[in-house]
């Protein structure tokens, strides 16, 4: 793969590209990376590349030098990327896609940015590495290059490690441990020491789910949404199997039994609910067992519900809010929503995607 970086400070990249894994990849011919100075295409005797923007403060990179720089190195197989907080977020999937390109051009902004006409004319896509502003786009370019390089065969000593790293399956990676078994009184989880590979795999998956749900709810709801046909269950301690009816039964510890029964009866439009057992309609065959525990600390449950269509989805959310529940984080497309009831039990509500 060939990568070219357009920047006002081409020397900025020298040290990172000589070091560590990227340096080895370049040395071994797996990557060819060159940084170029936009000032080489500046205007006039003084190679001017920036000017004051109309009706604004600061300085802006001019359209002509940027366009000339891009066209000078652009090929038929080139993909031009502008690093900007206005771009789409960098993800593992995007890194995989970029790793398949043969020639990438990274355009690094400086000052107040770049004249919009240059972007409209020459840029194929904009990528953001986060919701914050940097002193220059060079840092972002290095982040993207590092992320995509992991998916180029031969760059990593063990390509399998790239597939197992955090976020590659849509979830955060769980904790890792090495020797000694006990450090300052903290022990390595026993399951990792028993040699049961299936038990370890189950433990890692559960810890990964829990950590993602707690630390990155945005990733968690995206994970649930992207895996439409995969069952994602509540945590084991919150779920039991009904031997009589063979249905998924979830125990919800509540402060006020009457209040919670009224809330869920109205939410799911149940005409004659029993005192503490609510049968949720639909194909899920879920039964909620309400257990009154008063003001003591409750074990909160994590549940998911997929509705048949968009109208049902928004109707459900409207009822939830009207009845006193809280609406929390939504995914980027608004098709998945986290909600909570009076007692803090969390539901992931989504609807089926139209194929």
Swiss-Prot record:
Enzyme nomenclature, EC number: 2.1.1.228
Q: What GO terms in the biological process aspect are recorded for it? A: tRNA N1-guanine methylation
Q: Name one Pfam family in it.
A: tRNA_m1G_MT
* Gene3D superfamilies listed in its UniProt record: 2,3-Dihydroxybiphenyl 1,2-Dioxygenase, domain 1, 3.40.1280.10, tRNA(m1g37)methyltransferase, domain 2
Q: What class of enzyme is it?
A: transferase
Under PANTHER family, the record lists:
TRNA (GUANINE-N(1)-)-METHYLTRANSFERASE
According to the record's subunit comment, the protein's assembly and interactions are: Homodimer.
Q: What does this protein do?
A: Specifically methylates guanosine-37 in various tRNAs.
* Designated name of the protein: tRNA (guanine-N(1)-)-methyltransferase
Q: Which organism is it from?
A: Chlamydia caviae (strain ATCC VR-813 / DSM 19441 / 03DC25 / GPIC) (Chlamydophila caviae)
Q: What is the lineage of its organism?
A: Bacteria, Pseudomonadati, Chlamydiota, Chlamydiia, Chlamydiales
């Amino acid at each position: 793969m060939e990568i070219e970086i357009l920047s006002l400070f081409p020397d900025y990249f020298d040290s990172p590209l000589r070091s560590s894994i990227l340096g080895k990849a370049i040395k071994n011919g797996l990557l060819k990376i060159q940084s170029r100075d936009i000032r080489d295409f500046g205007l006039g005797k003084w190679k001017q590349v920036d000017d004051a923007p109309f009706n604004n403060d600061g300085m802006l990179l001019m359209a002509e030098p940027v366009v000339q720089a891009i066209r000078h190195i652009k090929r038929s197989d080139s993909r031009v990327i502008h690093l900007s907080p206005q771009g789409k977020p960098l993800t593992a999937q995007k890194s995989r896609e970029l790793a398949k390109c043969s020639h990438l051009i990274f355009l690094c902004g400086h000052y107040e940015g770049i004249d919009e006409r240059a972007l409209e004319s020459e840029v194929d896509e904009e990528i953001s590495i986060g919701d914050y502003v940097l002193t220059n786009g060079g840092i972002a370019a290095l982040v993207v290059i590092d992320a995509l390089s992991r998916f180029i065969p031969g760059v990593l000593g063990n390509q399998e490690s790239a597939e197992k790293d955090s976020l590659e399956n849509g979830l955060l990676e769980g904790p890792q441990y090495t020797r000694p078994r006990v450090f300052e009184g903290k022990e390595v989880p026993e399951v990792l020491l028993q040699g049961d590979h299936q038990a370890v795999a189950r433990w890692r998956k559960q810890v990964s789910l829990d950590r993602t749900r707690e630390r990155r709810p945005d990733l968690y709801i995206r994970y649930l949404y992207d895996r439409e046909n995969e069952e994602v269950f509540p945590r084991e301690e919150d779920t039991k199997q009904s031997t009589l009816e063979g249905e998924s039964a979830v125990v919800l510890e509540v402060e006020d039994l009457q209040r919670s029964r009224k809330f869920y009866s109205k939410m799911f439009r149940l005409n004659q609910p029993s005192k503490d057992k609510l049968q949720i309609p639909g194909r899920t065959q879920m039964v909620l067992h309400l257990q009154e525990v008063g003001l003591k600390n409750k074990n909160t449950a994590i549940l998911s519900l997929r509705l048949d269509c968009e109208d049902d989805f928004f109707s459900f959310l409207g009822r939830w809010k009207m009845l006193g529940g809280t609406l929390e984080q939504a995914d980027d497309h608004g098709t998945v929503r986290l909600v909570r009831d009076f007692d803090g039990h969390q539901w992931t509500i989504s609807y089926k995607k139209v194929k």
